[in-house]
C-alpha cells in the first residue's frame, strides 16, 4: 500500500479512441505515480493532430546565429521532415527500444530527430553540443547507442565549431556505434568514413509518411544526463505520457500561453529546459516556438531584444546569468528596441537575485510584464514552483519562486528528517507526493536513483535544494544544500548572500563559497564581477559590501575575502562551476578536475592569480 497520494495523468489528446486503465507505477517503496496505461503516441500529440487542424501554422522559428536570417517551419513541414527521418532511422536498423544519441546545435533538424525517434519508438539522448569528446563518449556508452546524429559544424557567436570532429573522436571509444548520420549546417566539407551517412541526401530518398508506433504511457521517451555529486553523470529517464502532460500544462499555465503566441525560450535543446519548453511543451500545445542558435552578446548586447522585436515574441524565458550579464551593458541596449509584444518574462536555471529581477521587470518588461522565477530540475521534468498560475493581479515578490504548481506538494524538512510545518521556516526542499513529469529512474542504475532521491528523507522526493517558506507561505530557493555555508554554527545560503552583494550598484554578479576556517569552521569567500562602467577601488568595494551584508543578513555573514574577477568560471549553459572556485580557494589547484565544459577556460588562471595576490597580502581577512 502506497502511503502517498497518486496523480492520475492521462495524455489522450489525440483524436484516436483509446482504452485507458489506471495503474500504480512504483518508483520506490513509498512513492508512486499513477498514470494511464494507454495506446497513445507522444509525437502524434506534438505534430499530427495540429497538422489536421492548422497545417500551415508556424511550429518552429529557427533564429540562426546570423541575425535576420530566421527560418520558419510549419507543422506540415515539420511532420514531413520527422517522417523522412523516422524512415531513414528504420532503414539504418533503429528499432523500438533503441536509444539514439544526438550531438547537435539548436536547429529544426535536431527537433525533427527527437520527434523521429519518438515516432518509431526509440528513445533519444541529446548531448549538449559543447561537451568534450570524452563527455560525449561517456554518454554514448552508458546509453548503449548504435546510432549518433550530428552536423558537420555548429555556428555560435560568429564562430564555427567542428562538431563532427568531436563525434569522430568520441566514437573511437564507443564500440556500440554502427553509424553516424551527418547533416550539413555549413557548406564546409568534412571527412566521411564508412560509418558516416550523409543525412540530407539519404533522408530525401524516404517517404513523407511514417506511421507512429503506439507506445504505453510508461515507455521511455528520452534519456538526459545531468551532473551527480559523485561526478559520474546520471542518465535520467523520462517517459511518454506523464512527461508530455506535465510540460504542456506548465507551459500553458505558468506563462499564460495562448494560441497564436510566439514563445521564446533561449536555452539550448541539450538541456532539460530546451526539451520541455522549446520542444515538447510548446509543440504539444500547438504553439510557435523559437530555436535560438546564437549568444546574448552576438553581434551586440541587444541581440535578445532585437529578436523580440523582429519575431514578435510574447513570452521570453532566459537564465539569470544572461540577465546579469546584459545588465552590465546598461538600459540603452534594451530600450532602443520595441518590446511591446512581450507579455510574460521567465527566469530559469538558478535563483534570480533581486537587482537582476528588478532590472528585468523594469527595463526589459517596461514594468508591465510579470516575471515568473521558475524552480524545477532535470529530475522534475517541468516547472514545480513559480509565481504563476495565480489570480491575474496576485502579488509577485522579486527573487521568489513562490507558489507550487498544480499537484506539487512541497515540504521542508530539518536535519533530523522532521517536517517543518510552520511558515517562516528554512529546510531541505522535498516533494511529498508524486507528479506526472518526474523522472522514473536512472538508466541502468535504479539503486542510485532511490539512494539519491528517496533514501535521504524516506517517503519524500529529495530535491537537493534548500528553501525558505515565508510567513505568507511563499517559497524562496536558497541554493543547493551543498552550497550552504556553515559559519560558526549559522547556516548561510549562498543565493541569499549573493542576492545582497548583487544589489551593490557597481556589481554585475557574484559567487559566494565557503572555505575551511580554523575558528569559525567555514569562512565566506566572495568573487565579484563588476559592471562594465564601474570604477571603484577594491578595498572601498570590500568595505561597502561587508556593510551591506551586515545590514541585510548579519555580521556573521560578512565575507572574509572579496575578490574582483573579470569573469566567473561557467559551463557553456551558464552555470557557475563552484567546485572549481572551492578548489582554488582551498589551494587545491592541481585537483580542479575536468574543465572541458567551461565556456572560458582561461578565466580559471586569472582567478588563481588574483586569489594568490589577495591571500598573499592578507589585508582583507
Task: Cite the ranges covered by each PLM segment.
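Conserved pre-ATP/AMP-binding loop-to-beta segment of ANL
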Residues: 56-58, 178-183, 187-188, 193-225, ...
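ANL superfamily adenylate-forming
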Residues: 3-4, 35-37, 67, 147-217, ...
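Conserved AMP-binding/adenylation subdomain of ANL enzymes
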Residues: 242-262, 269-315, 325-332
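Conserved AMP-binding/adenylate-forming core of the ANL superfamily
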Residues: 44, 56, 60-115, 132-137, ...
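Gly/Ser/Thr-rich phosphate-binding loop
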Residues: 203, 284-287, 314-318, 327-395, ...
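AMP-binding/adenylate-forming catalytic domain of the ANL superfamily
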Residues: 182-183, 519, 551-576, 588-618
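AMP-binding/adenylate-forming catalytic core of the ANL superfamily
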Residues: 102, 127-153, 167, 309, ...
